[in-house]
Amino acid sequence: MKNNIEEQLELPCGSILSNRLCKTAMTEGLSDQLNRSTDELCTLYEKWSKSGASLLITGNVQIDRRYMERAGNVAIDGKQSNIQIEKLKKWASAAKINGNHCWVQLGHAGRQTDARINKVGLGPSPIRSRNIAGQIFMPSYAPKEISKREIDSIINKFSYAAKICKEVGFSGIQIHSAHGYLLSSFLNPLANVRTDNYGGKLENRYRLLLEIINAARRTVGPNFPISVKINSSDFLRGGLTDQESATICKALDSERIDLLEISGGSYENLAIFRGKDAFNDKNINEAYFLDSSREILNTIKNTPIMLTGGIRKLSTMNDLISNHNIDMIGLARPLCGLIDGPKKLIKKEIYELPKYEDKINYPFFLRWLKIFRFGKVIYKAAILLWCYDNIINISKNMPFDSKGEKINLINIIIKMYIYEWKKASSLKKIKSRGLVYRQNF
């Protein structure tokens, strides 16, 4: 019997995805000192192109080099040199070598800007993130409140970056409005207390997102896929609720976007890492954000929906597509170890992807830390650091941990901490001031 994941999907713009599996965005940290694409990115994405997934979405490509979530982000910020264009073309070509789609995730780190690069992030309001779990060793600072002039500039930067992505050969873009980054923080009433047209009531808080989508659409035309990634909920008391998210998604559904990816949480909350209900600590073993997405699923009429977060079993994937109005399945961490996991699922060589997060080696003398929130953050952040390390090794054609046998908490934290520090120290020609990189604005 044919799996549901094998079925094609036609997008509203007319593009066709050959199956229902997507490698979703994961930050790679592989750019050069000028935040340009590299041969390592080409190697990595050529391998993922052969994974069997019909769609690859790149990690954060920043539209402003001053505000990056990692020093190794690629950036499309302003006029691109001939060298930059050629590097992007090479990346796009490698990422589509197997006939799949590759879309660029465009984003702005906002108040979650890596403090090693820039201590002064940018936010809708000057409100500091309460706990940046993803940067557990980095202090967070109150961001600068974005002005109307800067809002206009950001809209133009997203639109221009979308234009470049189309010109160099990528097959679509995704606008990142989840996980607490700039566009997500505009939606979050805890982060956005503005009193102008971009704050206050819900339709004002999602105004910037709609303006960016419309500007990008005018630039790339009607036949180029545009996706949006959004939280089903922030899982923060007083933050964006699932009901509000459903209202936003209804507005997006009228904007003729081509794929809506549903995720959840932010670096202020463990839901992004652990797959638990943030309010009652209830374990959710698969499809972390399905329950919080119910209202969205009942609201959307025109836009295909992709669900991301903890989906591992083939039976679950097929059930989501058959019975829950899910059109695409988003996969991330498993493809850092089992690169050809989608192909194996389609061929029924396997029936479940590995759950590497269950294999973390927490030293015995530190296990008591898991009692506390801080310890839980470190424990769950370790799997992301393991993904980062594997991504680096895969990109360099080096041996990597395909079975999750080397997830040692302390070793991986130290190794990646050094890597990130060196990467931030190596940046060139960027005007910002951080804990490592110290040019003046």
Over which residues does each language-model region extend?
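Flavin-dependent oxidoreductase catalytic cores
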Residues: 1-441
